[in-house]
């Protein structure tokens, strides 16, 4: 009988190999423009590899963002609260919260796109699972740094 923990390790190894293979394909490409299909594909891959498929599939929008590469937004009562300003203590418990991720139209490299998407997925995890009142760059956020490093991803504040 196989252990269940090996399955999780295999997903992480598969994620790392898939990221490395795709990174070599886009190695010399400057100015990566993601499509919604690519964004959803990599969301599913990272969700399965790092988050054990815990994150809900949320809408993703690719648009021009001012001063940001990406945002994880909690929309409750049409207030569209971005991460960092998200305070769950102010949200009434009977209101459903709609989450979505916004990504910039163009990234310097493919790796920047993947790192940004994974970064926003950590904020989504903070909002949906940890119920972190602020969901910003705190100890809950940086607790993912080792898992990201093992998968070959970078987790930084910006």
Task: Tell where the protein language model's regions lie, with residue ranges.
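Extended, alpha-helix-rich binding/interface surfaces that flank or overlap catalytic cores
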Residues: 121
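Active-site-proximal or metal-binding-adjacent scaffold patches in catalytic folds
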Residues: 1-115, 124-158
């Amino acid at each position: 009988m196989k252990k269940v923990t090996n399955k999780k390790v295999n997903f992480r190894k598969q994620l790392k190999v898939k990221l490395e293979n795709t990174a070599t394909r886009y190695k010399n490409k400057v100015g990566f423009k993601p499509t919604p299909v690519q964004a959803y594909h990599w969301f599913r891959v990272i969700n399965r590899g790092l988050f054990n498929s815990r994150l809900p599939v949320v809408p993703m929008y690719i648009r021009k963002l001012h001063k940001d590469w990406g945002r994880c937004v909690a929309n409750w009562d049409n207030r569209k609260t971005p991460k960092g300003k998200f305070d769950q203590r102010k949200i009434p418990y009977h209101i459903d919260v709609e989450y979505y991720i916004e990504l910039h139209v163009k990234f310097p490299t493919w790796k920047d796109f993947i790192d940004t998407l994974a970064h926003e997925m950590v904020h989504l995890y903070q909002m949906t699972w940890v119920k972190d009142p602020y969901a910003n760059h705190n100890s809950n956020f940086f607790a993912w740094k080792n898992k990201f490093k093992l998968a070959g991803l970078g987790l930084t504040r910006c």
